[in-house]
Structure formats: C-alpha cells, structure tokens
Amino acid sequence: MAHCLHPEKFFPVVKSVALPPGSLNGKVALVTGGGTGLGKAIATTFAHLGASVAIAARRLDVLEKTADEIRSSTGGVCEPFQMDVKDPAKVAKAFDAVEKKLGHTPDILINNAAGNFIMATERLSPNAYGTIIDIVLKGTLHVTTELGRRCIQQKRGASVLSITTLYAQSGAPFVVPSAVSKAGVENMTKSLASEWAKHGLRFNAIAPGPIPTEGAFGRLFAGELKDSGDAMKASVPVGRLGHPEEIANLAAFMSSDFMSWMNGAIIDFDGGQQHIHHGSHMGQFLHEWDNEKWEETENLIRGRTGKEKKSKL
C-alpha cells in the first residue's frame, strides 16, 4: 500500500479562504477559463479577498451565471468578459473592456484557459493537436503578452500565474499535445520572469496533480467522474485528491503581495503523486511487502555482508 488510508485524519480538506480579508483590496484580477472548474474557484477566492475580478472565456452565458454566483456568495465584484484566447484581436478587445469596466489593466493575471483529451498519439490529426496548442500555448502567450505590453507602456506592475500540470515536466503518454503546450507555458514563465521583472512583472506557475472538476475529468476519463477519481487516489501518497478551493488558496497567496519576491517558480501541488516511487522501478512492488518479506531481505543482506567481511580477513 503506497498511500495513506486515513487522509481525513492526517490531511484534512480545508475549503475556507486562507488569507486575511482584504488581502487583494484594490487589485484587478483577470482569470481566463474563469467560468467553471479551477478558474471559478480561483475567481471566487479572489473576490472574497477584495479583488475586482474579471472572468473570461468564450461562452458568455456560462460566465454570466458564474459571475452572478460569485457576487452572491462573496458580496464582491465579479464581471464576465467574452474572450477567445486563440484570437489576439479578441484578447485585446477583452482587455479594453476590462480596463473600461474595472478601472485599469489587471494587476493579477491567472492563465487558466485550457483544453485536453486522451488519445493515442498516432490517431491525432494536425487539427486535433493544433487546437490544443492554439488554446494552451499560443492562447496563453496571446493573453500574457497583451498584458505585458500594456503594463510596460503604462509603467504598471503585475503578477502572472499560469496553471500548468505535473506532466509538463515529466511528459506523459496519450496527452502529448497538452504536455507539449504546458511545458511551453512553464518555459514562458521562467523566461519572462527574468526578462520582464525590470518592468515590475513577475511570473509563476502551479503544476497541479489530480483535482476533480467536471470539465477536466470529463474530457480525460471514460466513465463516471467518481470512478475516475477513486482509481486515482491510490497513486497519491496522501490518499486523496485535491480540491479546487485548495489550489485557489495557493493561487491567491502566490498572486498577493505577500509573495512579491517569488518569481520564476513552478510549484508542484499534487499530494506527492510524482514522487510516489521516487524514480525507482521497484517502488511499486516494495510498497506491497509485509514484515516477513522485509525480515527475509534484511537477513539476506546481513548474511551477504557477513560473508564479505570474512572474505577480507
């Protein structure tokens, strides 16, 4: 057994907002992909903390419903803005609208717009992988550079936080377009951290492990969402999956002035999933050994060590 059987005892889920009230007062925060899932959770937390939140995506009807929910639950400011990250002209138009409605260029950008699906790579058409690259990599670049140009021209600072994935660093089968794109976003993060800090902009990323949302899990896994999640818990050492509110708290902290010295960081947020076997091909088998097997192995090692000592005398 490689994972904790009692996560509720040792690793409880805390969904309340972590930062003090007012921690983001006076900030304008733009969250792409903000209508659902992780983006919605992040936008909600930001509104709780006093930010004027702009949520952006293609479907205005979804955004309007989410904005109403966030305003109702937080008493804060949340406005919907239609944006297609694949189209630089539409990105610029959305920024114009945000500035007009909320007063100025965003102080915080959350790059959360994404697209993904599981498929054998040899079955992917150029259009299929091109769509993912257009959204995840090129779309993130469109939004980030639009913000950057405006901030540099206006001599404004900003915090840019991109949501990537664990396999951006390791690679993963059957999600090649997403892996390629997210790896590019992480390299953009580190590159701009060194290039644009002189202009007052800082760049970081969160690489989450499995955090169930209807959108992400629905696209990636066959069957019911719950079944997909239950099967994945065994791969996470802490014995449970993440929750959107948890990544929202981390995003708020990293985006806030409390973390103004953090720049160029990629933060893994996965319950230890990537380290479960520590790169050892034996790890998955060793977790299943009982005390008898370990005692047998210890005796073999002691016996071998004793023979080696005698041979040297």
UniProtKB/Swiss-Prot annotation:
One of its GO terms (cellular component) is mitochondrion. Transmembrane segments: none annotated. NADP(+) binds at residues 29-61. It comes from the Eukaryota. SUPFAM superfamilies: NAD(P)-binding Rossmann-fold domains. One of its GO terms (biological process) is fatty acid beta-oxidation. Disulfide bonds: none annotated. Its EC number is 1.-.-.-. GO terms for molecular function: 2,4-dienoyl-CoA reductase (NADPH) activity. Keywords: NADP, Oxidoreductase. Pfam families: adh_short_C2. InterPro entries: NAD(P)-bd_dom_sf, SDR_fam. Belongs to the short-chain dehydrogenases/reductases (SDR) family. 2,4-dienoyl-CoA reductase subfamily. PANTHER family: PROTEIN CBG11484 (PTHR43658:SF2), SHORT-CHAIN DEHYDROGENASE/REDUCTASE (PTHR43658). This is Uncharacterized oxidoreductase F53C11.3.
